[in-house]
Every structure is written in C-alpha cells, then in structure tokens.
C-alpha cells in the first residue's frame, strides 16, 4: 500500500480578490501562509514523512510546500518544480474579477468558462503579458505547446503525462510523495485517480491549504482518501470555491 498527499496552495492574493489567476504569479495572503503552516502541522501530527515533493513553478504553490515542509521539520526534502503542475491557464480572463465578469457576461457564461469540461476561455494573444512565452521560466518549453487558454480537459492532458512519466514511477519505487499544486491541476489528478467521469469532476471543489491523503493499492488505485482537518470548515471552504463565479 502507498500513501500520497495532495495539497492545494493556501489562499493567494487573487483568491482573496476573487480574480481569475491561472498562470499569473501571485503571492500568498497572511491567511494563505497560516493555512500552509496548519497543513504542515496536521501532517506532522498524523506522523507523515516524505521522500520526494513535487510542485508547480508558481510562487503560491512553491511557498505553500516550503512552509508546510518547514513546519514538519522536512525543509531539506528534494523538490521538483514543473510547469505541467501549474494551474489551468485562464486565457483572456486572467486578472478579471469573477463577480464583475459574471455581472457583465452572465453567471451561466462564467460557469461555462470556469466549470465546463472541454470549453476553454477566450485565448490570450501571443503579445499579451499573460502569454507564458514572455516569462523566462518557460524558456526551455516549446512555445507551441504553451497554453493560451485551457479547459479542464486541456489541463488534464497537460498534467497526466507528468504523473505517468515522473510521479507515478517514484511512488511505485516506494517513495513517499507530496504534491503541492493548484485547484485545477489537482482536480486533474483526482479525476484520474478516482476514475471520475467528465460530468462528475465538474462538481469537484478543492479547498485551499488542506492536505488530501490517499491510500493506494499496488496498482495505484485508491483504497481510501480523506482531508485532514475540521470537516465543517473544509466543507465551507469547498462551498466558497463553488460560489466564486456568481455575480454580487
């Protein structure tokens, strides 16, 4: 049996401001820092230790991982950062206020952009500040495969090769793994691990800064999964995520 821990980054500044964030690099809020510390303490209290950590190349996920590991006394852990674990790219919606966008375009349209499986948001142009090709951290990535805007389906197609090629072999080799990433890159992994349908995943909301613990069999099929922390508080956080696209 293997154990795998997934954690969405703590609250970011644009989470707080209810903006579409995607690949834009924003920092954690004070609440987000506190969530990361709490996550680390919960994992420590539950007796977790890790051999390998994975995260995206975005500050909010990197910082969440570092803070949690420091709380556990495992700040020395090997960490691999990769763009394939980044958040879904929100295209031309990046930076827009979700509630204002819903008021302008209608809640149903924003729900389609946020929660449909295979409909991407409007794409950014290559000369946009939000096109990843202008960011030096992606210099070694072919510009043709960098996203201009992604649906959840496209995000899954980006994330899963990294799971199969890198993370899965480490787990099967006996390494204890933690992944700190983002709402949609983690939805991609949860959908795959749980065998969720395209329709089922639309209702999946992942709270910020809460460790999700999987027990997996020898084929990496889930035996069990649970969030660490107060169940009522976690449900409230999930409900808040679901309501982000509503007009004020």
Swiss-Prot record:
Keywords, in A-Z order: Gluconeogenesis, Glycolysis, Isomerase
GO molecular function, one term: phosphoglycerate mutase activity
The protein's name in its UniProt record: 2,3-bisphosphoglycerate-dependent phosphoglycerate mutase
Residues holding substrate: 8-15, 21-22, 60, 87-90, 98, 114-115, 183-184
Family annotation (Pfam families): His_Phos_1 (PF00300)
Annotated catalytic residues: 9 (tele-phosphohistidine intermediate), 87 (proton donor/acceptor)
Function: Catalyzes the interconversion of 2-phosphoglycerate and 3-phosphoglycerate.
GO terms classed as biological process: gluconeogenesis; glycolytic process
Sites annotated Transition state stabilizer: 182
UniProt-listed InterPro entries: His_Pase_superF_clade-1, His_PPase_superfam, PG/BPGM_mutase_AS, Phosphogly_mut1
Intrachain disulfide bonds: none
Reaction catalysis annotation: (2R)-2-phosphoglycerate = (2R)-3-phosphoglycerate
